[in-house]
C-alpha cells in the first residue's frame, strides 16, 4: 500500500529520481503548492539521512517533519496550514551528525533573458557573470550560482566537496531553449572544489571542469575551484586614465616578453616558481630599469602540460595556479601600472587541447569544436579548432577576452596563431580540408569573429593594443574593420624577423651577397602597422639563442648582436624582445629552468644589457623613433645599396621640431675611417650612442661623441660629414640639442 508521503510524488517520478533519470528535478524537489494552492509540500532527496525537519529561515523555528518515502533518501511532507511559500532550511539528521541545509530547490532561475539572448547570438561580453560559479545573494541568502552550457546533455549535476561528489545530490535546472543548466547553492564555501557531472544521450557519464572556472586545481588534478569573494582593490586609476587617451601607434612601445615560470626561480636547486609577490619585487624594478614600456606575458590561463608554455589552455578563465591566485595576478598588474609599465597577454583563441576534462565533446557532442576533423582538428598540434560559426562559442571567446581586459586591467592581447585561424587549408594537403561557401580557402567564420572581436574590444576598452601573430601576407590585418580589415592594432613582422635572423647567421664575408635581407622589409613596412618581434619562438627547439646564431668568436658575436639591436631599434615599428635576449643568453630558452643570470658576472653580457637599456632610453626620449612609425615620411634611406661594405644608413624623422636621428650600422668587422655620410641639417651632431663604446664591451672606435657637419651635399642631403664607422657597430647621431621629452606613456 502507498504511504501518504509517496502520494506526493508523480507516478514513477520517485523511481526515476533515484535512478538519475529524472531531469526536471526543480518541478519535483523543493517547495510546491498542491491541491490548487491550498497546501504546501516539500520534497527532498538526501542519501543516508535518518530524519528531516523543515525550519523557517525567518525565525529558526521548526515548521514540520518530513516523512521518509523510502530507504534511499526520499523525504516528503505537507506544511500544515501554511499555503504561502517561504524561505526554509532542512535540518537533516545523519548517523554521525546533524546539519542545517538551505534547500537549493526552493530558488527560481537567476538567469536574465537579455543575457541569454546575447549569449546565443554571439555578442555576450560578460558571459562569465552568469556562467561558471558566481557569488550571488538571493532573498538575503548568500550562495554560489552554478551555470553551464551543455544543450545536448540528458542531465547535468554539480558535484564537489560540498556534496561528497554525489551526482544525484544537486541536479541542475535545464533551460531547453538555450541549453543552459543552473543551480543556486547556499551551502558552499570559498575554495570548494567542484566539477560538472554530465550524462550524455548515450548514457555515458563524464565529469568535466567548468569552462568558465576562474580557478582550477594544480595538475594532474583538474577540479574547478569556487572563487574568493574578496577582490583586489585597484590603485591604477592614473595609468588607466592616461592609457585611454594614448595613441599607441604614435608612441614608444618596447615590449619585454616573459614566461613567468622561467624568468627567475627560487629554491636551493631552482625548482620553485616565483610567486606574484616575488615578481612584483624583482621583475617590475628590472623592467623599469631596463627601460621597457610593456611586459608581454606568455599565456597565464590554466594549462596542464608545462611543455605547452600555456599555449594549450584548458581553463581559459582561470589564471594558472603556478604563480598564485587571481588576486595575486591582479596585484602584479596593478604594481606594473603604478610603475608606468603596461601589461599585455598572449591569448589563445585559435585552438584548444583534447584533455578529457576540458572542452572536447563537452556534452557528448562536438559543442565547441567542429564535428568534421577537416575543419575541427589542427594537424600541427593535434588540437581542436573552435567552431566560430556558433554564437555561444563566439560569446565564450569574446567574454574571455573582455574578462582579462576588464577584470585584470590588462592593456592588450596578443593573439597566437592567427594564420591558422584565417585559412581552412592551413598545414593541410589537398583533400584534407573543406572550402568555404564560395569555394575559397579563407575561414570566413574566423575572419568575421576576429573583426567583431577587435571592434568590440577597442570600443569597450580605450587605449588597449590588439596584436596579431600572423605569418602570411593576408591583406588588412591592421586595417580598420569598417574598411574590410581585421581591425588589429599591430601585426608581428614575421618577414623582417625571418630575413634579419637569416642575415645575422651569415658569415660577415658573405653578408654583402644578402644585403637585401635587411633592406627588403622597408618595401612593405607601411602596408601594415608592424611590430618587430624577436620572440620565444626564435630561441627554442634547437634554434639556439641569438648569440648562438651569430658566427665568429665571442667578440664578433657580442658586437654583431649589439649592432643588430641598434638596427632593430632604428627600424620603423614597435619592438618586442624575449627575456634573456637583453643580456645575450648563451643557451636557448628552457622552460624548466631560470634564465642564466650568472652570465651578468661577465663584462660582455653586462655590455649588451647596458646597450639595450640605453637604446630604450633613447627610444623613449626621441619622438622621431616612434611617432611616424607607420608613415613613410618618418624614414629615409641614406644608403641602402652599400652591400660591398655591408653598411646601412638611414634617418628617422618626427614631426615639426622633433629631432631627426641618423643611424649607421656596419655588419662586418672592418673599421671605416673617413667615411662620408649625409646629414639632414648642418651644425654640430652628437654621437648619442655607439655600440662599440667600451661601456658596452666594444673596441671604443668612434667619433668621440661629436660630429661636425659640412655644407657638402651627400646622399640627397644638403650636409654631410666624415665619420669613423666602428667594426660590427651601430652609431646613432643627432643634432646637438637638449634631450627631448619621454615619448612613452
UniProtKB/Swiss-Prot annotation:
Keyword Ligase tagged: no
Catalytic residues identified in the record: 416, 469
GO cellular component: cytosol
CDD domains linked to this entry: AmyAc_Glg_BE, E_set_GBE_prok_N
Organism domain of life: Bacteria
One Pfam match: Alpha-amylase_C
InterPro entries: A-amylase/branching_C (IPR006048), Branching_enzy (IPR037439), GlgB (IPR006407), GlgB_N (IPR054169), GlgB_N_E_set_prok (IPR044143), Glyco_hydro_13_cat_dom (IPR006047), Glyco_hydro_13_N (IPR004193), Glyco_hydro_b (IPR013780)
Family assignment from sequence similarity: Belongs to the glycosyl hydrolase 13 family. GlgB subfamily.
Listed name of the protein: 1,4-alpha-glucan branching enzyme GlgB
Source organism: Shewanella sp. (strain MR-7)
Taxon lineage: Bacteria, Pseudomonadati, Pseudomonadota, Gammaproteobacteria, Alteromonadales
Gene assigned in the entry: glgB
